[in-house]
Curated annotation (Swiss-Prot):
UniProt organism field: Oryctolagus cuniculus
Record: residues binding a divalent metal cation 1: C5, C7, C21, C24
Region (Beta): 1-29
Binding site for a divalent metal cation 4: C33, C34, C44, C48
A GO cellular component entry from the record: cytoplasm
Protein name per the record: Metallothionein-2E
Signal peptide residue numbers: none
Single GO biological process annotation from the record: negative regulation of growth
PANTHER family: METALLOTHIONEIN, METALLOTHIONEIN-2B
Assembly information from the UniProt record: Monomer.
Keywords recorded for this protein, A-Z: Acetylation, Cadmium, Copper, Metal-binding, Metal-thiolate cluster, Zinc
Residues at which a divalent metal cation 7 binds: C50, C57, C59, C60
Length: 61
C-alpha cells in the first residue's frame, strides 16, 4: 500500500501504520494516519508527520 495514502477526498481507504499523511485527503484516514494528533485537528491530512506513536505531530504541535 502507498505509505503516503494518496486517495481522493472523502473516499474511504485503509492506511498502514507507516503512513505519514503526506498526501492523505480522505476523512477515513485522518485518525489512523495521525493518531498522535489531538481530536479535532484540522491539519491532520496536510503534511502531518508524527514524532512518536503517542507524541504530538508536526502539524498540531
Amino acid at each position: 500500500m502507498d505509505p503516503n495514502c494518496s486517495c481522493a477526498t472523502r473516499d474511504s481507504c485503509a492506511c498502514a501504520s507507516s503512513c505519514k499523511c503526506k498526501e492523505c485527503k480522505c476523512t477515513s484516514c485522518k485518525k489512523s494516519c495521525c493518531s498522535c494528533c489531538p481530536a479535532g485537528c484540522t491539519k491532520c491530512a496536510q503534511g502531518c508527520i508524527c514524532k512518536g506513536a503517542l507524541d504530538k505531530c508536526s502539524c498540531c504541535a
